[in-house]
Amino acid sequence: MIEHNPTTIYGTTIVTVRKDGKVVIAGDGQVSLGNTVMKGNARKVRRIGKGNVIAGFAGATADAFTLLERLEAKLEQYPDQLMRASVELAKDWRTDRYLRKLEAMMLVADSKVTLALTGTGDVLEPEQGVMAIGSGGNYALAAARALIETDKSAEEIARKAMNIAADICIYTNHNIIVESLDAQ
């Protein structure tokens, strides 16, 4: 668990759902500084690389942007190899003194694979095609898992999971951004 520092910008919820030939990453737009909402429409889910990878990040905002930039550099080194780029980033994350102190996590996906890159330098694949991170991640994960076996689409599941998380988590709002890709 990340220790809360009231002078650090925290909070968000990111969820990913892979179902029926689609992969979706959704995130909210709230940025909090301590117990104050600083911004309600931040964009924490975006396309990276050549537009064939989607990423969502949670944690300390500056740290998350640093990791996002590092992942983009790895994707330039290893184009169309998200798994390899992520593993190489994780190696750097574990060995670089500066990167080891970063307090952020990312969910990334391309047409083939969905991964979580954790603050400890781990690269994890989701079970059941669903994964969530951030302050409301457990709520979004539970909601998405409950809905994955229904006839709802990946995007519908992600949006519903995000709305449930936003109803419960004070660091998550209802300004939801969704990015999707066709999946194999």
Swiss-Prot record:
It is an enzyme of class 3 (hydrolase). PROSITE patterns: PROTEASOME_BETA_2. Allosterically activated by HslU binding. It catalyses: ATP-dependent cleavage of peptide bonds with broad specificity. Na(+) binds at residues 166, 169, 172. It holds the Pfam family Proteasome. InterPro entries: ATP-dep_Prtase_HsIV_su, Ntn_hydrolases_N, Proteasome_sua/b, Proteasome_suB-type. The active site is at residue 12. It comes from the Bacteria. Gene3D superfamilies: Glutamine Phosphoribosylpyrophosphate, subunit 1, domain 1. GO terms for biological process: proteolysis involved in protein catabolic process. It is found in: Cytoplasm. One of its GO terms (cellular component) is HslUV protease complex. Its EC number is 3.4.25.2. Keywords: Allosteric enzyme, Cytoplasm, Hydrolase, Metal-binding, Protease, Sodium, Threonine protease. One of its GO terms (molecular function) is threonine-type endopeptidase activity. Its main location: cytoplasm. Protease subunit of a proteasome-like degradation complex believed to be a general protein degrading machinery. A double ring-shaped homohexamer of HslV is capped on each side by a ring-shaped HslU homohexamer. The assembly of the HslU/HslV complex is dependent on binding of ATP. NCBIfam families: ATP_dep_HslV, PRK05456.1. Belongs to the peptidase T1B family. HslV subfamily. This is ATP-dependent protease subunit HslV. It comes from Brucella canis (strain ATCC 23365 / NCTC 10854 / RM-666). The gene is hslV.
